[in-house]
């Protein structure tokens, strides 16, 4: 008996998709090894390492919702000595996973093969995804969870779908989990919840209730740690982001970075680093055309009740994602994370017609190149020199640990660059868990709050270190001058180390300066 051609074709399609995913994962792993170090990585690497000894908020400061360090905590033991590169590798795989989940969501939503591929490649080539998957920040995990939640929620819209209640529960868990990993994903999660409530008669009470229960479970990590240390959690999740970036920019005469005109330009620029801007314009044009001629839809845009419901859901998610991207100041590319999945999914569903025109295909290809360009430029030099910044930092961290242990120095290591010290085997002073971010604040915390939140701002440095002299101080990565720190943020640490007779050693792989406590 000959086999049916359909299963054979289906298997071939899945094998092809798996091959593309493996290639993408390999490229993202390569990028993670050769991308330069971003100082934002410090607090996320430190938080995972400090999970060996405590919990976010209660035992060390953390400036986001807490799912990522909780979920990745086992790596602090499994990858000891290699934690920084391991966290980058995990993010690379999560980034590739987000692309796979978006492709699955597009296929489930009824996109053609080309439309689903377009949605996936648009996300994969966006600067936002490439940045999230190349560094050890907290952008890849919530993006993956959000794309997974979107894929899981789509069957709930189908009256004939199996296991709708289970799918709704898992969707709520994933979407709320994304918000528990990064607070800005709370807006799209809330948008899905609002959509479900507005369509409760169509979706049914069971799936809507399951979605809500899943959402509550996904939020449990945040609720739990908030209950353990409510003031510190509120500060880390809400207050810091509402106060500290504004204070820093104002003190340094950079108020224009916070203003709406420049914020709009920055948002458009980041959307243009990939297919975001093209997708937004295409969706806008399609909406205007559908309103002008609602009864003359082409075959590729078949108008069905399910398609209309999907469109309403995605448009609501796009709106929520745009608000989530707009609210933080200054705007950076990673803030597009809550916006891009729904945007590219909708783009894949409606782009079949526009893609028949050669100039549209050329524009999409150009947008994809624009998204890849910055990452390509950033890693090209390191690839040519065969220099991996993350491995160089790990080598220096290990050398620092050897030097500190050779002096039998007790105590912790102090640094504004925790990602460069975490693999030394020497405990990090938890007051520096956020790297430079709480250190550089002026009036964001009172002295009592800084003590309660396990932080040590610059103006309290002398008193704080005098009371607990560190085994070593690692500097050299925060030398950029600013108005309130003309010699760089590392300068107060260097000054304190010199006054107390610490011996300087230059680490060979990165040129960082390690100050060792004098023998007693």
Describe the predicted segments one by one.
Residues 208-250, 323, 327, 334:
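Membrane-lumen/periplasm interface segments of specific transmembrane helices
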Residues 100, 266-308, 315-322:
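Hydrophobic, aromatic-rich transmembrane alpha-helices
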Residues 132, 139-142, 187, 322-359:
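Hydrophobic/aromatic-rich transmembrane helices and adjacent perimembrane loops
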Residues 158-159, 188-219, 286-300, 345, ...:
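Perimembrane helix-loop-helix junctions
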Residues 107-110, 149-170, 197-200, 277-293, ...:
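Membrane-interface transmembrane helices that cradle and orient dolichyl/undecaprenyl
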Residues 89-110, 125, 148:
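Transmembrane-helix motifs of polytopic, lipid-linked glycan transferases
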Residues 119-120, 165-183, 188-195, 215-216, ...:
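Membrane-interface alpha helices of multi-pass inner-membrane proteins
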Residues 190, 274-276, 390, 394-444, ...:
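Short periplasmic/luminal acceptor-recognition loop of GT-C membrane glycosyltransferases, typified by
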